[in-house]
């Protein structure tokens, strides 16, 4: 059994339901801290996201917030909204189209523990060359045939 989580997972989303489902499923399936708090902020969604969160929050142990804003706060505002509600030592922000791998959270946590000063740890995007731009900053290009089932 895993120890209590020092991390809260956070996603801010807008109209990205098919990928949001995969992101949430991958976090709960592949995280070391499977019981970590998980906050979702959904703003001005019209694609069924609000309803899906209402129907599936118990299954995935989600704390979710649905906002309808005349002036959208956007992803940055949504991340700040989530951060204000975190009570753990660390926050892991994810985009709603991320798919995480096994023990991804433990790897990041272990890396943070190597540093005594406040540290910012981030990941690289790993994808096939979908945009015909192999020099995209922060992107690691892999051959299409090795990428996996979600290509």
Give residue ranges: language-model regions.
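Cell-envelope/extracellular polymer assembly enzymes that use nucleotide-activated donors
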Residues: 6-8, 37
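Short, acidic, metal-binding catalytic loop of nucleotide-sugar glycosyltransferases
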Residues: 25-35
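A conserved acidic beta->alpha catalytic loop
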Residues: 42-51
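Conserved donor nucleotide-binding strand/loop of the catalytic core
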Residues: 54, 58-73
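Glycine-rich, basic loop-to-helix element that forms the pyrophosphate-binding segment
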Residues: 69-86
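Short aromatic/hydrophobic "clamp" motif used to bind/position activated sugar donors
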Residues: 91
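Conserved donor NDP-sugar-binding/catalytic core segment of glycosyltransferases
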Residues: 99, 103-137
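A recurrent flexible, glycine/aromatic-enriched loop bordering the glycosyltransferase active site
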Residues: 135-151
